[in-house]
């Protein structure tokens, strides 16, 4: 007994490619049509004989090309019909087999939450949903769904005894989004004979980087995020701070004018105030996030302050002084 393995989609693709070849042949025939009647270059016998020879060859070419085109059309028709026939036969064969597979998987799925045979479902993109586990005996883990903005991608599903773990979903569109974890290798149920473990899927890539441009940016140095509101960017070259709306990633309002050479910036999780180090004026400016205006007078610290951080428990502010080799503490 002999068997033939056919992929109907590949047969249909081959038929389409063959049809394009036929189109190219017809184009070539049209271009060569003028060679069937070649005019003599002069009235002498030699020129007339050469023209007749070329014209004869052109006529023979057209005759052969017509036969090739006719054969090619029949070949494309046969290939297209074969693809359709194979597709119908495949669909007819798949239905009863799927019914048998459903009958086998139903009790296993009910008892273990996982089928015996079959691939796990992919997680829904934009939700960070984990991919489904593959079947106990055979099946690839589903891919994790991509995360929403700022959310990690979903973990890939585990493979069965035979199969590959699903790939982790990509993180949401934030530069620090965490990638989804890879799907676990397959393993046999307790008491079963273990087969070769499935290969864990690769973790998804981190989220894509979004570039924000604005006229107020002038040698931007530091950036800090207010957990309950805006993003603050220091512009060293213009002595200002730009405010970004994280919902739209666009600059909002006018730049906030502060000291000279603003460098570092930090937000207090205790008070919500924004602290900015002014490198050239040896001070720290404080911004009220509710009004986005400077509050009070600049606080004098050491020479050339750069870095700044806020203690999340006490609210104390720590400032590194680049040229003074000191650290200032603001209570």
Swiss-Prot record:
Domain PE: residue ranges: 1-92
Signals that turn on the gene: Highly up-regulated during the early stages of invasion of the human blood-brain barrier.
SUPFAM superfamilies noted in UniProt: PE/PPE dimer-like, YWTD domain
PROSITE patterns xref list: NHL
InterPro entries: Host-pathogen_enzymatic-act (IPR051200), NHL_repeat (IPR001258), PE-PGRS_N (IPR000084), PGRS_rpt (IPR048996), WD40/YVTN_repeat-like_dom_sf (IPR015943), YVTN_b-propeller_repeat (IPR011964)
Pfam families: NHL (PF01436), PE (PF00934), PGRS (PF21526)
Swiss-Prot/TrEMBL keywords: Repeat, Virulence
Keyword Repeat: yes
NHL repeats: from-to residues: 217-247, 260-290, 305-331
More info: Elicits a strong B-cell humoral response among different clinical categories of both adult and child tuberculosis patients. Could be used in the serodiagnosis of tuberculosis.
Function in brief: Induces maturation and activation of human dendritic cells (DCs), via TLR2-dependent activation of ERK1/2, p38 MAPK, and NF-kappa-B signaling pathways, and enhances the ability of DCs to stimulate CD4(+) T cells. By activating DCs, could potentially contribute to the initiation of innate immune responses during tuberculosis infection and hence regulate the clinical course of tuberculosis.
Protein family: Belongs to the mycobacterial PE family. PGRS subfamily.
Subunit structure: Interacts with human TLR2.
This protein's name: PE-PGRS family protein PE_PGRS17
Species the sequence originates in: Mycobacterium tuberculosis (strain ATCC 25618 / H37Rv)
Lineage: Bacteria, Bacillati, Actinomycetota, Actinomycetes, Mycobacteriales
